[in-house]
């Protein structure tokens, strides 16, 4: 469980480095599964075979790859088990102060050694227009030691209280990643009144939490080490479907506008119920890695 001090830090900054949540053997199992899924690619899965929703290069540059995989858990029992990690799910319930937590989707972020590119500054919530309120907290689990040399995230503490500024962030050129915010003035009533770009290293097997409106991005991987991580995006029991929005996960949502996302079905499993982490589904308790 997180301490009151940690919860207060997250409330103030919109980001928090958490504890170790998976062991070295578990990390290696997930790495092996990631290699298997990437080797298959978007077109390598047989008809009817469980597969991710999407595999893509976020950088759009084959020489500066940033691999993104959405819902790898649907293709891998090992990654599906991670969704139910009680240290993570209990922390999400604490940080949101909500008794019921559901998975929105997961997102692998993989920067290969020596050439993994920049992921520009952004906020998560504006890219999820099918949800209201936006999913509030993401758990980001490192599968390698992540630091500035291999493309760790950078955060702007306090920015989650400034509102939606995705248009401003999208205008920041990639080559000026480390110059963000020189021309930005936070709201006059904001608790934090300056753009303070902060490197965000995370140890292998540890988790980092960030709010869906916190400004964040990541630099190039210039090291000889890969930078592998998975973001677990969660939503609370308050989340509602916005039919006018668009998102890769929308095709799995068979709901009327403004319906509770808690009714969205098997692609959005519940992981906390009435403040208590949900145990592993029976199908996962003895499921082998595929």
Describe the function of each predicted region.
Residues 1-13, 19-121, 127-130, 245:
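Non-heme Fe(II)-dependent double-stranded beta-helix
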Residues 40, 45-48, 61, 165-171, ...:
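Non-heme Fe(II)/2-oxoglutarate
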Residues 51-56, 123-124, 179-194, 224-226, ...:
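Short, surface-exposed loop/helix-turn segments at secondary-structure junctions
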Residues 96, 124-136, 195-196, 202, ...:
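A short beta-loop-beta micro-motif enriched in histidine and acidic residues
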Residues 98-101, 125, 130-131, 141-152, ...:
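Active-site region of the double-stranded beta-helix
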Residues 112, 147, 162, 236-238:
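Feature marks short, surface-exposed loop/turn motifs that line or immediately flank catalytic pockets
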Residues 129-148, 201-202, 209, 233-236:
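Short, conserved beta-strand element in jelly-roll/cupin
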Residues 146-215:
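Double-stranded beta-helix
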């Amino acid at each position: 469980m997180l301490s009151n001090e940690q919860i207060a830090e997250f409330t103030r900054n919109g980001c928090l480095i958490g504890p170790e949540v998976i062991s070295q053997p578990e990390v290696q199992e997930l790495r092996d599964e990631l290699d298997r899924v990437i080797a298959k690619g978007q077109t390598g899965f047989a008809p009817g075979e469980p597969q991710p929703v999407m595999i893509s290069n976020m950088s759009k540059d084959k020489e500066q790859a940033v691999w993104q995989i959405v819902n790898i858990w649907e293709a891998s029992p090992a990654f599906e088990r991670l969704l139910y990690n009680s240290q993570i799910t209990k922390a999400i319930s604490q940080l949101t102060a909500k008794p019921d937590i559901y998975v929105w989707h997961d997102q692998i972020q993989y920067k290969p050694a020596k050439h993994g590119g920049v992921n520009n500054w952004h906020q998560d919530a504006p890219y999820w227009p099918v949800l209201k309120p936006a999913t509030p907290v993401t758990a980001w689990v490192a599968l390698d030691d992540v630091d500035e040399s291999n493309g760790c995230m950078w955060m702007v503490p306090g920015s989650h209280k400034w509102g939606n500024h995705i248009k401003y962030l999208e205008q920041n050129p990639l080559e000026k990643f480390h110059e963000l915010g020189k021309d930005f003035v936070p709201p006059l009533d904001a608790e934090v009144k300056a753009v303070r770009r902060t490197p965000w290293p995370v140890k292998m097997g540890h988790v980092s939490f960030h709010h869906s409106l916190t400004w964040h991005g990541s630099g190039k991987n210039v090291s000889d080490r890969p930078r592998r991580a998975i973001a677990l995006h969660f939503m609370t029991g308050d989340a509602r479907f916005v039919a006018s929005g668009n998102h890769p996960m929308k095709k799995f949502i068979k709901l009327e506008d403004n319906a509770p996302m808690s009714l969205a079905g098997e692609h959005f499993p519940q992981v906390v119920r009435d403040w208590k982490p949900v145990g592993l589904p029976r199908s996962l308790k003895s499921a082998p890695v595929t």
